[in-house]
């Protein structure tokens, strides 16, 4: 397998992996049973926050109380871009860390904007996937440039989403720990989103390498083609050597020169032939028969 094909397939493999992880990350939290119940963003001890459960998990679309036996209970109603804001989720409480009361907007908008960036990143990710597949089918400058541009745009939005989510929930962990409450990040969700970022980095680099290699090959080809045309224009047309005429002379001139020599530089040679009429004739009766033949013999100057 050539170097280019290897880079193409590595690029496509990593891009498909990033697309799969992003879809799974968005679907995570859609159900609070089965495997998806373990895909959450944040878990903390919320006992004493008015009517909040003792332990709460925040998912993509809702939050749920979490029991020690591994069952989600008392879940909130589902909604897209469920914000992380204990004050909005449970109401104000004196036992709640003060940062959630004083800096409510920071947590609220970090979580919601992070979700929006994730959806925008998924949109550009699908465009990137289509453009990369198109460049594999028929590679040209436009498809390669589109795939590269979409790869970097997708990387920007997915990375921005990962940073917003990480910043939001890392601040929340610090706030809960400051109040001696247990809190932790969801390892599976953050593992998925940062793995997606890594795959997209590799994809963007591969697309850039392919475009750079393609442009370099076109530049080398253009220069070699231009130099070949220059040499061909300066070199006379080779003509086979015929009759001592230089090979650089056109064929028509050679034919005209030979025709000219045939008319002016040939002489006629006569040869004499003796024949004996009969074997018994005497020498004095030998008859000489003059037979003249004409031959065109070229004269060597």
From Swiss-Prot:
It is found in: Cell membrane. Residues 27-112, 165-191 are cytoplasmic. The chain crosses the membrane at residues 6-26, 113-133, 144-164, 192-212. Keywords: Cell membrane, Membrane, Transmembrane, Transmembrane helix. Residues 261-275 have a biased composition (Basic residues). Residues 282-292 have a biased composition (Basic and acidic residues). Its main location: membrane. It is a multi-pass membrane protein. It comes from the Eukaryota. One of its GO terms (cellular component) is cell cortex. Involved in sporulation and affects the sphingolipid composition of the plasma membrane. This is Uncharacterized plasma membrane protein YNL194C. It comes from Saccharomyces cerevisiae (strain ATCC 204508 / S288c) (Baker's yeast).
């Amino acid at each position: 397998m050539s170097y280019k094909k290897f880079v193409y397939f590595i690029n496509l493999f990593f891009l498909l992996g990033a697309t799969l992880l992003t879809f799974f990350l968005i679907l995570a939290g859609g159900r609070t049973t089965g495997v998806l119940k373990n895909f959450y963003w944040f878990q903390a001890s919320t006992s004493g926050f008015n009517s909040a459960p003792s332990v709460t998990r925040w998912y993509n679309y809702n939050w749920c109380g979490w029991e020690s036996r591994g069952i989600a209970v008392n879940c909130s109603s589902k909604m897209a871009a469920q914000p992380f804001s204990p004050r909005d989720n449970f109401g104000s409480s004196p036992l709640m860390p003060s940062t959630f009361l004083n800096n409510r907007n920071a947590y609220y908008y970090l979580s919601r904007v992070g979700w929006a960036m994730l959806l925008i990143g998924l949109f550009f990710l699908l465009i990137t996937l289509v453009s990369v597949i198109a460049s594999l089918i028929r590679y040209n400058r436009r498809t390669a440039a589109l795939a590269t541009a979409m790869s970097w745009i997708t990387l920007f939005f997915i990375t921005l989403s990962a940073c917003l989510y990480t910043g939001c929930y890392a601040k929340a962990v610090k706030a809960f720990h400051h109040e001696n409450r247990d809190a932790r990040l969801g390892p599976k969700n953050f593992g998925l989103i940062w793995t997606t970022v890594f795959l997209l980095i590799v994809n963007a680099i591969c697309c850039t390498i392919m475009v750079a290699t393609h442009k370099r090959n076109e530049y080398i080809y253009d220069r070699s083609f231009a130099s070949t045309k220059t040499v061909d224009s300066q070199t006379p047309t080779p003509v086979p050597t015929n009759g001592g005429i230089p090979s650089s002379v056109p064929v028509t001139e050679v034919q005209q020169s030979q025709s000219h020599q045939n008319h002016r530089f040939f002489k006629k040679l006569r040869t004499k032939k003796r024949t004996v009429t009969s074997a018994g004739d005497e020498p004095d009766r030998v008859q000489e028969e003059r037979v003249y033949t004409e031959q065109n013999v070229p004269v060597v100057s």
